């Protein structure tokens, strides 16, 4: 079962990377991503693949390891 979960996770990451590289439009929303706290590392998972994949005004930001949707700073 661990092998199956690892395989599914790798496929999901591969699909996200492929989508991010080959998506037809890259919408960048206004504002900047908030700075991560010093010496912090977030969850190593890709929960977004660009600002267009985040709801409302949120941006796709690095969390120190992966990417997550966060409210921007202006």
Curated annotation (Swiss-Prot):
Residues 1-23 form the signal peptide. The keyword Protein biosynthesis does not apply. It comes from the Eukaryota. SUPFAM superfamilies: Elafin-like. It is found in: Secreted. One of its GO terms (biological process) is antibacterial humoral response. GO terms for molecular function: serine-type endopeptidase inhibitor activity. Its main location: secreted. Residues 26-73 form the WAP domain. This is WAP four-disulfide core domain protein 18. It comes from Rattus norvegicus. Involved in the metastatic potential of adenocarcinomas in rat. Could have proteinase inhibiting capacity. GO terms for cellular component: extracellular space. InterPro entries: Elafin-like_sf, WAP_dom, WAP_four-disulfide_core. The gene is Wfdc18. Keywords: Protease inhibitor, Secreted, Signal. Spleen, kidney, brain, liver, lung and cell line Rat-2.
């Amino acid at each position: 079962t661990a092998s199956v979960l690892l395989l599914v996770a790798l496929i999901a990451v591969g699909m996200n990377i492929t989508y991010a590289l080959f998506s037809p439009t890259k919408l960048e929303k206004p504002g900047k991503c908030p700075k991560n706290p010093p010496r912090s590392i977030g969850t190593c998972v890709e929960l977004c693949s660009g600002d267009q994949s985040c709801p409302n005004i949120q941006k796709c930001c690095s969390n120190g390891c992966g990417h997550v949707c966060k409210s921007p700073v202006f």
